[in-house]
Amino acid sequence: MFTGSIVALVTPMDEKGNVSRSCLKKLIDYHVANGTSAIVSVGTTGESATLSHDEHGDVVMMTLELADGRIPVIAGTGANATAEAISLTQRFNDSGIVGCLTVTPYYNRPTQEGLFQHFKAIAEHTDLPQILYNVPSRTGCDMLPETVGRLAEIKNIIAIKEATGNLTRVHQIKELVSDDFILLSGDDASALDFMQLGGHGVISVTANVAARDMADMCKLAAEGQFAEARAINQRLMPLHNKLFVEPNPIPVKWACKALGLVATDTLRLPMTPITDHGRDIVKAALQHAGLL
């Protein structure tokens, strides 16, 4: 459940910005039907930053309910205050989620020791499996391989989503962790190379609109069929890149709407709808991928 193509799921909203239960069910059904390994609910792509704490919990629980055991659900539980991250995590202790994705604290830029103590404290307050999440472009904070190695010794810290796009990190981390520690790419464009170097899968934005392709690519990579996997990846490469032509999740929400997976591409301020220029770029990438 922690390998292969794991989708960083968008949070669908109606025109008033309320979470759409019917569209969420449609998205979950789509991923169940198309081989996605697991869902990350309310991560960055799921607009965690603009949901209230109550809404955050409600969306995760709604996702669990609608998934109904058909696909594993991972909850995003990151925060830039350790106590808040612990509180979010503990809310899901007996919920049925299979684990938590916890981003490095953003904005306050802790030291490496601060990062270690942050994740250690969270792990000590739950039995849920923890996936570390390193995305310096978003947080202003880079968790170094040596810190990951220290954290990997904690029993319920089982994986990392490494989203720097720096492939040398795969080698650096693998040298410092046990063989059962899971390495997940957080960068669709380099995910296949990441897996070829020993990674186990990807937490994917692209999978929101290309679930079957991403699942097939990851399966082929796991089986060592990299030529076949690369053929899929090359077709998707413009999409991997152009889904970030404007800040995530602006482009991918529009793409979901364009494919009929959600009813609207509504976002909450300060996120604004995609520009006409951005829409044209994403549309061309969807067409190149054979999705539109």
Curated annotation (Swiss-Prot):
Q: Where in the cell is it found?
A: Cytoplasm
Q: Name one GO molecular function term.
A: 4-hydroxy-tetrahydrodipicolinate synthase activity
Xref: PROSITE patterns: DHDPS_1, DHDPS_2
One GO biological-process annotation of the entry reads:
diaminopimelate biosynthetic process
Regions annotated as coiled coil: none
Specify whether Oxidoreductase is a keyword of the entry: no
Give the reactions, separated by semicolons, that this protein catalyses: L-aspartate 4-semialdehyde + pyruvate = (2S,4S)-4-hydroxy-2,3,4,5-tetrahydrodipicolinate + H2O + H(+)
Alphabetical GO CC annotations of the entry are: cytosol
User: Which cysteine-cysteine pairs are annotated as disulfide bonds in the entry?
Assistant: none
As for what it does, the entry says:
Catalyzes the condensation of (S)-aspartate-beta-semialdehyde [(S)-ASA] and pyruvate to 4-hydroxy-tetrahydrodipicolinate (HTPA).
Spell out the family assignment given in the record's similarity comment.
Belongs to the DapA family.
> This chain belongs to which protein, by name?
4-hydroxy-tetrahydrodipicolinate synthase
According to its UniProt entry, this protein's organism is Salmonella typhi
